[in-house]
């Protein structure tokens, strides 16, 4: 089944409001009441309210995203461990006590796609603030992208090479926790093909193939699945920098 595109309104970034007072306090309450009831609202004011509402919503999403990011960088065992390993790769000749991950490499923004995050070898990690459900969803997403970050530093991944891309996607889906039992069951359940035995591996294969299918060098879904199968054994069993699948 094909996935429908995101709503078109998500692709549009709103303009800032005319003033901060227009989106706070009594003025914002009054405008919201007028919009919901239609009382005393001109077409121009209605359009302006819709723009301002999107602005307020995206600002809240952005603030919450960075709040979650900062909390996870300080308290999530998985995220802390991954950032430490990345810092070591970035600073091989530096004393381990001063390893520090640059959190500016993790930014929050609005995304037009359904995905919850992304990684770019030059820019770093993007968290899709409008797709994140809660702190724990962001933890899985951030852990996934940090595996890509680690792989890119350690092996100089060619992201247009389908085998390279597939290998990192397999590792990221397996090690991030996004395919742990309860997470996958919540997404799919028994009625949508979820199996208790080997469910983790099936989830990893499915999600890796979805990601690889978006590579410009991938022809179609079947091509992505075939490439994932080709590199499966070596990549799934490579749990570095963990000793084993942690989550």
Curated annotation (Swiss-Prot):
Pfam families noted in UniProt: Peptidase_M76 (PF09768)
The keyword 4Fe-4S is annotated on this UniProt entry: no
Alphabetical keyword list: Hydrolase, Membrane, Metal-binding, Metalloprotease, Mitochondrion, Mitochondrion inner membrane, Protease
EC number(s) from the headed UniProt entry: 3.4.24.-
Binding residues for a divalent metal cation: 144, 148
Enzyme class of the recorded protein, top EC level: hydrolase
GO terms assigned for molecular function: metal ion binding; metalloendopeptidase activity
Annotated GO biological process: mitochondrial protein processing; mitochondrial proton-transporting ATP synthase complex assembly
Active site residues per record: 145
Bilayer disposition of the protein: Peripheral membrane protein
Domain of life: Eukaryota
Cellular compartments annotated: Mitochondrion inner membrane
GO terms for cellular component: mitochondrial inner membrane
Residues covered by region (Disordered): 1-21
Family assignment from sequence similarity: Belongs to the peptidase M76 family.
Matches recorded under PANTHER family: MITOCHONDRIAL INNER MEMBRANE PROTEASE, MITOCHONDRIAL INNER MEMBRANE PROTEASE ATP23 HOMOLOG
Function, in words: Has a dual role in the assembly of mitochondrial ATPase. Acts as a protease that removes N-terminal residues of mitochondrial ATPase CF(0) subunit 6 at the intermembrane space side. Also involved in the correct assembly of the membrane-embedded ATPase CF(0) particle, probably mediating association of subunit 6 with the subunit 9 ring.
Identification of the protein by name: Mitochondrial inner membrane protease ATP23
């Amino acid at each position: 089944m094909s996935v429908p595109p995101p709503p078109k309104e998500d692709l549009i970034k709103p303009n800032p409001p005319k003033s901060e007072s227009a989106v706070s306090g009594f003025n914002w309450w009054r405008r919201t009441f007028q919009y919901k009831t239609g009382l005393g609202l001109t077409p121009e004011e209605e359009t302006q309210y819709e723009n301002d509402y999107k602005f307020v919503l995206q600002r809240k999403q952005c603030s919450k995203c960075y709040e979650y990011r900062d909390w996870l960088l300080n308290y999530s065992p998985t995220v802390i461990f991954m950032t430490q390993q990345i810092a070591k790769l970035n600073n091989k000749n530096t004393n381990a006590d001063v390893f520090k991950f640059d959190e500016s490499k993790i930014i929050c923004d609005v995304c037009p796609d359904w995905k919850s995050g992304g990684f770019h070898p030059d820019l770093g990690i993007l968290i899709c603030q409008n797709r994140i459900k809660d702190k724990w969803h962001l933890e899985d997403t951030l852990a996934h992208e940090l595996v890509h970050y680690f792989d890119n530093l350690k092996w100089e991944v060619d992201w247009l090479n389908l085998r390279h891309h597939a290998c990192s996607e397999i590792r990221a889906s397996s090690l991030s926790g996004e395919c742990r039992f309860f997470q996958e069951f919540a997404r799919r359940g028994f009625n949508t093909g979820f199996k208790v035995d080997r469910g983790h591996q099936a989830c990893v294969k499915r999600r890796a193939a979805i990601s690889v299918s978006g590579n410009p060098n991938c022809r179609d879904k079947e091509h992505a699945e075939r490439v994932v199968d080709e590199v499966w054994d070596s990549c799934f069993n490579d749990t570095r920098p963990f000793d084993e699948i942690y989550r």
